[in-house]
């Protein structure tokens, strides 16, 4: 078993042993379909599904793989970052991709084997986690200050900009060590989008993307790599998905939202970011900098991506049936797993549209599991 996330809680480490997380290409060893109904919709099937992408969502894929093992599905998932995962899917080396940002037009154009379907199935807070001796969780930071930290303009923890937002906190003069992602990352795209919203210098400089030229700091691969670097360095700050922050017992900032409120990343404030969310036809939603007093402002959605008609894309029927069962589980019974792992479930309004898209998955133009 090749485990893609190095920093794991005992709670889902056991699940990993049953999941079969492995580094491998798309497999034709997909077994056989029984045609009986399975939990969350679709058909019961014996299949091996190979995926790659988001480290943000890797704990979900790992645990869901364990959940579905007794239903005949083996899910092999590589947490290589959203950009690499989408590239592998476009190249046809995996059956599905995990990505935190929605597919961009250039991503869709690169997927030559068939039209893709992207299913947003969970929300997660991107924390501004710090390792600062003597300072508890809840340090207040706004978007401009975070941008200036990552621009290298705010260099110490007792900088006036941080002091002004935290007058009652005894801040040390410790040097700030900036940690960022070194790989192509959906977490990076979400974080840089937030910074650009509050910093013209960021917007016109480093900009918004899955992989940018960083003005300062140390790069690390994956959410787990950033978490490890922050944990090892007093004075460090890094942006990591909340599940990784909680696993490591990190302290993290209350970040100022669009309504002017400093909000801690919690399940409730993450869910609030999806209140009244606009859902485009391709389901490419975004929850960064959402309105609402209670919304945490740096919330990323995560997508599972495959083909609308997998058989036409070259996958066999059993594998395509397995993908539909897997996607159905993610948006139905899997939502309980998502909550247990400290991610927020999707709202009912989005789930209904997800269900329509999953129900429309086909094999050579025919419905699956009907």
Residue map of PLM features:
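Short helix-loop capping/hinge motifs at secondary-structure junctions, enriched
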Residues: 133-139, 156, 184-187, 201-202, ...
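C-terminal motif of bacterial Sec signal peptides marking the signal peptidase cleavage site
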Residues: 19-23
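Non-catalytic, conformational "gating/processing" segments within enzyme and secreted inhibitor domains
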Residues: 167-194
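Bacterial N-terminal signal peptides that target proteins for export
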Residues: 1-11
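N-terminal segment of the mature folded domain
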Residues: 29, 35-163, 170-171, 227-229, ...
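Extracellular/periplasmic juxtamembrane helices and adjacent flexible linkers that interface
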Residues: 2, 41-43, 169-174, 289-370
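Periplasmic-binding protein-like
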Residues: 119-130, 254-306
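Ligand-binding pocket segment of bilobal, Venus flytrap-like solute-binding proteins
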Residues: 86, 184-276
